[in-house]
A protein has these predicted regions:
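Small/polar residue-rich beta-strand/coil "junction" motifs that cap repeat-based extracellular fibers
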Residues: 1-40, 46
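Residue-level signature of catalytic and energy-coupling elements of molecular machines
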Residues: 35, 45, 72, 112
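Short aromatic/basic micro-patch
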Residues: 39, 66-67, 98
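Acidic, glycine-rich loop-and-strand cores that form catalytic or ligand-binding grooves
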Residues: 41-55
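Short acidic/polar micro-motifs at solvent-exposed secondary-structure junctions
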Residues: 55-65
Length: 139
């Protein structure tokens, strides 16, 4: 741990970090304030470009999946989020860009909820149209 309360495990030579249990983050309401509904949802998620790639430093040449930090940062900026904290520079001299992937979970949930509302509205429209077609066919 350094003076800015950051813990760094390894460097670009590290190929894997493993554990026996899932990583957890506190999410207790008592630790939060100024809570509002997240506006980022389907529009945000559909603007992201998921990619597969090989790491330049990867000893194992297995493909990984993710996002390009610079592209994510630009998408957030376009949507008015200049400093969302999800994309940052690390503390190395190279200042590599980092992504807090767990922060994508909330917008993905929001996107799924928005998509479900669209699906339900479309199902209702389809049902109405089918009834109208059936009524016309009976004439």
């Amino acid at each position: 741990m350094n003076a800015s309360n950051k813990v760094r495990i390894g460097n670009t030579s590290v190929t894997k970090i493993e554990g026996q249990v899932a990583f957890t983050t506190t999410s207790d309401k008592r630790l939060k304030n100024h809570i509002t509904d997240l506006p980022l949802g389907l529009d945000f998620i559909t603007q992201l470009r998921p990619v597969e790639y090989l790491r330049n430093n990867g000893a194992e040449k297995s493909k990984e999946w993710g996002l390009i930090a610079q592209e994510l940062q630009q998408t957030l900026k376009t949507l008015g989020y200049k400093d969302a904290g999800i994309v940052t520079e690390d503390s190395t001299p190279e200042k590599y860009m980092t992504v807090r992937y767990n922060d994508l979970l909330a917008p993905m949930i929001k996107a799924t909820q928005e998509q479900q509302k669209l699906i339900q509205a479309q199902a209702k429209t389809i049902s109405t149209l089918l009834r109208r077609v059936e009524a016309l066919e009976k004439k």
